[in-house]
Structures are given as C-alpha cells and as structure tokens.
C-alpha cells in the first residue's frame, strides 16, 4: 500500500519511539513570539540550559504590538512581554525580527515570505495557527509553552502520529468566492470537531489552481476544524514561491528533487475522505460564536437551533431566520495571519477603489508584515484605502484578538478576515463575523453585509 503525504513527512523526522507509542520528532524550524515564549526561556535559564539550535529558531513580535503607534506601548504587560522576548533572544542568541525591523510581522506571514517555511520541514510555534505553513508541504502545528521549552532545549518533540484525512476539492471557484469561503463552508457542513485526531490534506483541481497565499488561508483554518494540521503537497507554484527568498536553500536543484517526492501515492488510503465540489459555492458569513456557525450570504440564519445556538444568537444580538443582509457592521478588520497578505489587500482594494466607507463604520487595514506593507505601498494600495476612509496601519496581529489596543467595543459587530469568532475574541462583548477580504471590504462601504458577487469589481486592480 502506498504512503500518504503525512506518512512521508512523519517518517523522515522520527528520532525514536517509546513504549507508549509516542514518536520523538526532529523539528526543522521553531518560530517564536512574545506571548508563549517567556516561561519557556525562563525554564532554560533555571536549569542552566541553552537553546540547542538557535539557527533553526526565529522570533518576531506580533501579538501585543500596537499598529497605530508602534513606539508608544502603554500597556504594561504587553511592554513587559516584548522587552522580555528582546532580552531572551539576545541572551540565547536567537534571531529576532524586532519592532521596526524590515523582517517584522505576523509569525505565520513572515515565515513563508522569508523562505524559512519550506516543503518537507517540521515546523512548530506556540500558536494555534501554525498550520498555515502546511500549505508548503510542511508538517506544521501549534504547541504549548512547555513544549516550546522542550524544542528550545532539544530541537525535538514527543508526538503521537495523527490519522490522515483527505479533503478533495473539485471544480472552479466562482467569481467573488475565495479560499476563505471554502474553509468556512467545510466548517459549517462538518463542524469544529471533524478533524480531531487528524491531519487534513487538501488536494484536487481546485487546490492546483490556487496561488500560495490562498493555500495558506485554507491551511491556516484547518485547526478550526479540530485538526492537528493542514497540509498541501508541494508543486511548481510552491517551488516558484520559495525560490530566491532570503532563507531559501541555495542548492536549489538538489532540494527541488527531494520536494518533488512529497505527495500522497495513488494507491494510498486516507483514514477519512471528504470530497467537495466548489463550483456552486457562495461567499460565507459567520453569524455565531464559533467558525462552524456560518451560512452562505444568500441564506438566512438557521431557524432550527439548540442551546449552543440560542446562546450564540443572544450574544451576537441576532435572531433565527434573520437575513444576512440585515446584520449591521460597525467595524471592519482586514488583516490577521489568515488574510493579510498582498493578494488579500489587492482584492480588498479592488472593491473599495473610488468609493467611500459608510459613515459610522470604522475600517482598518493591517498588513501582515513590513514587507507586505512596503509592497502594498509601492503599488499605491495605501492611498486607495485611505481615500476610501480606511485606516492604514503598521503590521501586527491587531484586531484578530483582544490583547492589544485594536479592539471592537462591546455589543458592536465587526466584519473580520481573521480566523476566530469566539465570545470576546476581539474584545469584551465584541461580535465577530468571519468573511473573506472582498466581503469585509464591501461591508465597509454599506455598513452591512452584501453579496460581493453582485458588486462591480473584477477581483483585479488597476493601479492607474
């Protein structure tokens, strides 16, 4: 029987196996940020240990930094965490993309754009959405703080091998429908626990047609379906994306051959298989308090509901059977590790060019990294957004989570391109609706959700 992509990635990294069936995996890349690393570094300090492979470790500041005035950090805890990361990286000789550095940005944005993320690697980070890097054919997953310490000290991690789920995506995406809508559709249909104990492998003609940034969006939210990770076999688009980046391999031809071996064999069998035709897919909007509580923009909110739905309706201030078009939007956030890359900003800019944000709506665009920000400004996207009435910010996690100054006031609704809509995720009492960049941009113009498929934009932008 053939091997799945998961099998090939896993077997290449097993150092040892214990009596409980756990495998000790070698870790090729460890990404670090300011929130989940302080206790891990302190653990090394208390036991007089060093970081075993600082050359395979890379740190950045993203969660706590303000995006409006990055040099004016007023929150005491946030400043302490940022200062602590800076001190730890200096003491343990870990490379750091500090505030103001040209390489700084959201950890899951800078990894790929710097060429740190590569096919065949095992990648970990003390962050749930490490699955993003699986878009490159890497086995990437989030870990806890004690595991962060273990990897810092040993460059290994004990893990139990997950099962493999194959998700085949067939057909061509309609105009106005994106990778974000695919994953929201999957979550609404199969729930937030379907992937528990699995690694999701996305494949099929739809995947082949996607660019790398769309694939990253898809893998980013595999964790929202309960999966350990999301992966996509590398192809010519993967190779072209990685080639020439700062930390990309120099022996390109030899490494390219190794990457070409990373795929699921034709005679391999998944532990669970799902097939979805995307041809008739529509833009999605979440209405509740987990990412599976979503509907097509042309559907009404569910009439039948259970106790969890009842709580969600109450928290969100919505009613069963309500039209998605009637959901008010007071805030719009375009950013996060899900949708803050250049192509995301281009799509949003193409929607708002020459138009104005609805009076009373606060709209933010937060690029995922300094490099994304610079590239967007080179193309004039910042002017398009600012002329429309958006705030153009510095890179950071921003409004994705309520642990920095960018928050949604209690009881107000936000159209967000982020990945989680839990209670209080964007601030106490904040009401989060997950959507694609195109849908978020359109909501900013109207002050409520609209069907982007009916708007006059072509998904591409003219910079004239």
Swiss-Prot record:
Keyword Cell division: no
Pfam families: Aconitase
Keywords: 4Fe-4S, Amino-acid biosynthesis, Branched-chain amino acid biosynthesis, Iron, Iron-sulfur, Leucine biosynthesis, Lyase, Metal-binding
GO molecular function, one term: 3-isopropylmalate dehydratase activity
Binding site for [4Fe-4S] cluster: 337, 397, 400
Manner of cofactor binding, per the entry note: Binds 1 [4Fe-4S] cluster per subunit.
E.C. no: 4.2.1.33
Swiss-Prot/TrEMBL catalytic activity: (2R,3S)-3-isopropylmalate = (2S)-2-isopropylmalate
Top-rank taxon, per record: Bacteria
Biological processes annotated in GO: L-leucine biosynthetic process
Enzyme class label: lyase
Annotated metabolic or biological route of this protein: Amino-acid biosynthesis; L-leucine biosynthesis; L-leucine from 3-methyl-2-oxobutanoate: step 2/4
Intrachain disulfide bonds: none
Cofactor(s) the protein needs: [4Fe-4S] cluster
Family assignment from sequence similarity: Belongs to the aconitase/IPM isomerase family. LeuC type 1 subfamily.
Assembly behavior: Heterodimer of LeuC and LeuD.
Function per UniProt: Catalyzes the isomerization between 2-isopropylmalate and 3-isopropylmalate, via the formation of 2-isopropylmaleate.
Protein name as catalogued: 3-isopropylmalate dehydratase large subunit
Gene: leuC
